[in-house]
């Protein structure tokens, strides 16, 4: 009989189960309390109950645990400095959606060479999340598929659904199941309506299929996630200006949704010129000083060193520099946080 299935696949390895990985890297009671408490603080900000600003900041993607931990340690000092005005959360992205092809992140390819040691990548990701949370820094990530979230979601305080997947039904269903607040980015063309539709969908109960913690394919019923929100990330043109924020809030109001959102300083809003994140920051700070309550949070891409680098076989990487989108350096990060905290003073 002719084979009609698995004609274009080759098995690489057996995947570890979420339960097995969690047993190797368990969550302590103190970390569990930290994650729970940080989620509650973020929820209050998104509901307008807390006038502080959510700040999701960090490298475009994680590729070096040592550099990531150095960044996290410095970020914790900034958290303590600005805690009265800012709820700072570290961006810890392990999966990268690609427009065509490219490195897909630490979980898929931790060795950066196409060897796809996924079990090792999952181990590194969970280990880093534990260490960052143990420092007292909450973590944020993008949920890209139905499987990998089962390995790390218990350590995530804020999640994102990316511009390429906001319109996807299965991602909306997954968001309705997640235990953390979830932001939906507007489409790559700048369309914010798809993000509003995603918020509405994720607030509802859904049935969806996913592996459970033991790897058994399972039928889940979700209760819905009441903390979905828009991430304004720009598109063909930036959408961080006051009129863009007002238009998005009008759409939210139309559907009786909370008129609070997050502005991404990077991506379409900086037109892929990373230093423009500082210009976006200045504009957002002015909007906050002018009395805007719609801006509940911001996202920014920063690392220890400025810019980005390419992976070149046989050549060492520059420590603390991104291998995906270009980032601001640490000095600019401190300036950005100082400006945001000063602007939020006007809310008190």
Predicted feature residues:
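Conserved phosphate/anionic-ligand binding catalytic regions in large, soluble enzymes, centered on
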Residues: 54-67, 325
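Glycine-rich loop at the start of a catalytic domain that most often binds anionic cofactors/ligands
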Residues: 65-77, 100-107
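Acidic (Asp/Glu)-rich catalytic clusters
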Residues: 46-49, 76-83, 129-136, 221-222, ...
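Active-site-facing alpha/beta catalytic cores
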Residues: 2-6, 85-240, 244-245, 267-268, ...
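Conserved, mostly hydrophobic/aromatic
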Residues: 58, 263, 329
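Gly-rich Lys/Arg/Thr-decorated short loops/hinges at beta-loop-alpha junctions or inter-strand turns
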Residues: 17-26, 222-234, 317
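Internal helix-turn-beta structural module
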Residues: 303-346
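N- or domain-start disorder-to-order transition segments that initiate the globular core
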Residues: 5-46
């Amino acid at each position: 009989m002719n084979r009609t299935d698995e004609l274009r696949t080759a098995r690489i390895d057996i995947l570890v189960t979420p339960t097995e990985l969690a047993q190797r890297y368990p969550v302590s009671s103190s970390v569990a309390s930290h994650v729970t408490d940080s989620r509650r603080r973020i929820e209050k900000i998104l509901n307008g109950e807390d006038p502080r600003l959510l700040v999701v900041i960090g490298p475009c993607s994680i590729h070096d645990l040592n550099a990531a931990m150095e960044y996290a340690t410095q970020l914790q000092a900034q958290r303590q400095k600005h805690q009265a005005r800012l709820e700072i959360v570290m961006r810890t992205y392990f999966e990268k959606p690609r427009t065509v092809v490219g490195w897909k992140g630490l979980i898929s390819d931790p060795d950066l060479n196409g060897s796809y040691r996924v079990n090792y990548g999952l181990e590194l990701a969970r280990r880093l999340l534990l260490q960052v949370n143990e420092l007292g820094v909450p973590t944020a990530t993008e949920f890209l598929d139905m499987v990998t979230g089962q390995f790390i979601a218990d350590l995530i305080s804020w999640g994102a659904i990316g511009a390429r997947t906001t319109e996807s039904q299965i991602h909306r269903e997954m968001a309705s199941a997640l235990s953390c607040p979830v932001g939906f980015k507007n489409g790559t063309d700048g369309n914010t309506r798809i993000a509003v539709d995603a918020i509405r969908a994720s607030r509802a109960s859904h049935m969806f299929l996913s592996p459970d913690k033991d790897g058994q394919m399972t039928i889940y019923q979700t209760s819905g996630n009441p903390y979905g929100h828009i991430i304004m990330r720009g598109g063909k043109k930036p959408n961080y200006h006051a009129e863009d924020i007002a238009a998005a809030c009008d759409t939210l109001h139309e559907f009786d949704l909370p008129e609070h959102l997050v502005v991404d300083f990077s991506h379409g809003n900086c037109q892929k010129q990373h230093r423009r994140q500082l210009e976006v920051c200045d504009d957002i700070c002015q909007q906050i000083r002018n009395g805007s309550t719609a801006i509940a949070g911001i996202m920014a891409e920063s690392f220890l060193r400025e810019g980005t680098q390419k992976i070149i076989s046989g050549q060492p990487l520059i420590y603390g520099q991104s291998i995906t989108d270009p980032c601001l350096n640490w000095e600019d990060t401190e300036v950005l946080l100082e400006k945001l905290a000063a602007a939020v003073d006007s809310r008190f």
